Design a protein with these regions (language model features):
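The C-terminal output helix
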Residues: 131-137
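Cofactor-cradling patches in redox/metallo enzymes
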Residues: 26-131
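A glycine- and charged-residue-rich anion-binding loop/surface
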Residues: 18
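Nucleotide donor/acceptor-binding cores
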Residues: 10
């Protein structure tokens, strides 16, 4: 038995929220997480916050990973947090990635997002965060 065998298998919903069609990054991250033993549910492109939260609750995930490159992060991610609160699902952790300025990332963290991954973040950093970090956040 390895150390990984004694850890919980995390369930993470990944999604592209809004009208952004740039999905290569979220697919690469989703596959890397899956290959690292994380159960990944990829919701797909052009998801609304309502669709993401509904899927997250139905799939009983531990976390939502949101990818945004459209500049709508300060509208869409807070909406996801609001909907989670309305549905009494604040135990679902939210993290994000994409082109998100550092000032906005700090503001999103104040609102409850546990981490924002920017361009150039290594896949191993994201895997380590999911396997070890987000439940401690």
């Amino acid at each position: 038995m390895t150390a990984r065998d004694t850890q919980k298998q995390w369930r993470v919903l990944t999604a592209k929220v809004g009208l952004d069609g740039h999905d290569r990054g979220v697919k690469v991250v989703s596959r890397a997480l899956r290959d690292a033993g994380v159960e990944v549910i990829y919701a797909g492109l052009r998801q609304t916050p309502e669709m993401v939260v509904e899927a997250a609750i139905q799939e009983d995930v531990d976390a939502i990973g949101v990818s945004l490159h459209s500049g709508a992060h300060m509208t869409l991610i807070p909406r996801i947090l609001e909907l989670l609160k309305q549905r009494n699902a604040t135990d679902i952790v939210v993290f994000g990635g994409g082109i998100i300025p550092q000032d906005d990332a700090r503001e999103l963290k104040k609102l409850g997002v546990v981490e924002i991954f920017g361009p150039g973040t290594s896949l191993q950093s994201i895997i380590d965060f999911v396997n070890h970090g987000f439940k401690a956040a």
